[in-house]
Amino acid sequence: MAPQQTGSRKRKASEVEQGAGTSSLPGRAAAAAGTGQADGPLLLAKRPRRPVARRSLVHYLKGRALGADGHPGVAGFEGDLRSYGVLRLPELLRERQLTLGPLNKVFASQWLNARQVVCGTKCNTLFVVDVQTGRITRIPLMRDRGPGQTRAQPTCGIHAIQLNPSKTLLATGGENPNSLAVYQLPTLDPVCLGDRQGHRDWIFAIAWMSDTVAVSGSRDGTVALWRVDSDMFNGSIPWHNNSGIPRYSHIRPRDMEAIPRATTNPGNRKVRALAFSGRNQELGAVSLDGYFHLWKARSSLSRLLSLRLPYCRENVCLTYCDELSLYAVGSQSHVSFLDPRQRQQNIKPLCSREGGTGVRSLSFYQHIITVGTGHGSLLFYDIRAQKFLEERASASPDSFLGRTGRKLKLTCGRGWLNQDELWVNYFGGTEEFPNALYTHCYNWPEMKLFVGGGPLPSGLHGNYAGLWS
């Protein structure tokens, strides 16, 4: 298929990569650093005494920050601390807010590297933020080919951003929120746009099945399977025309499936979230009519089952844990756990108890699930113990004292709120307005957490972004 010329301007790759300048030491620089020779005679040094490895996550983190990765005792200790660190990290995290200017509500986010996070907002802005400097680089959105196609809808936004397993491609929405846009990493050059015979309404969710196959879920009640041809990004197709304008292919889905209509709420079968099981090669989906759907995902989609969820209001987020073969669904007041292979679910739903503001984002890591609420807080639930993580009796992070019985909760800062007429007339000029945490993503090697969101009421304009480390 011949690529089509578009009106999107080329960005210099250096603009996006500039923020990652200190994230890793180049190979030649590392080699040069290790070839220095000492002046004067060589002395026979005494064998250094082996330091005692201190069994504390705090000491490990401090040692790693000082470059002690190869320190005796630390290398073996790192594996032992991995599971323990998952439990202790939440209580060690401290917030640093990031300034995003007048952008409206961060809906989606993913780490690109140790310093950069790519985000999508309600105001249809795709940008990369350097979490160290705070610098923001906007990424031009891809445009549909036909002049009669739907253009940007600023009230919709970019609801999904996903990286493929090898982190060489990024999938998100286009200028038309119905279209699937794919960019190459790390340069964020445009690769292709799924704007032909695809969705008729906004894309709410994206999941990668492999490095070249992605699935999108839409508000029109359909799930589409897309394949990205390697010729589109391996250099066999010219990137630009003579004017320097980037070219990208316009593709159509390889398969499309509509979710079944529910008898209880047939008009609200919008696909809200997707999660892929690599182990089982299955795709899970949540629709706003209160159902969970499961497909066998190969070269096409074959629906296996549809289940009525125990809590069916505002099912807006879904995640999957390969280790536990378990899906987690967030709703208005609960997180429900589903194992499609079990008739009787053994894990009871957890209640967020956050004033009915709902669960807005979920993520699994090992046996801990992180819950972002609509009331500006992060909660942490241990699946094995089937209880929330609790605060410690001592403020010292090195303490091994008992728990207080109080739920461990991280409360996010105020962010920025546009104090316009709507805010004054309908919300009484309330100064303290909690932010809904629509997205969060971990950088586990660096033990950092990025959180994004904004005010929960749809009419309010504002944003929140924070780095927890």
Curated annotation (Swiss-Prot):
Superkingdom of origin organism: Eukaryota
WD repeats, residue ranges: 153-193, 198-236, 266-305, 354-391
Alphabetic keyword roster: Repeat, WD repeat
Entry keyword annotation includes Repeat: yes
Region (Disordered) residue spans: 1-34
Family membership: Belongs to the WD repeat DCAF12 family.
PANTHER family: DDB1- AND CUL4-ASSOCIATED FACTOR 12-LIKE PROTEIN 2, DDB1- AND CUL4-ASSOCIATED FACTOR 12-RELATED
Protein name as catalogued: DDB1- and CUL4-associated factor 12-like protein 2
Organism: Mus musculus (Mouse)
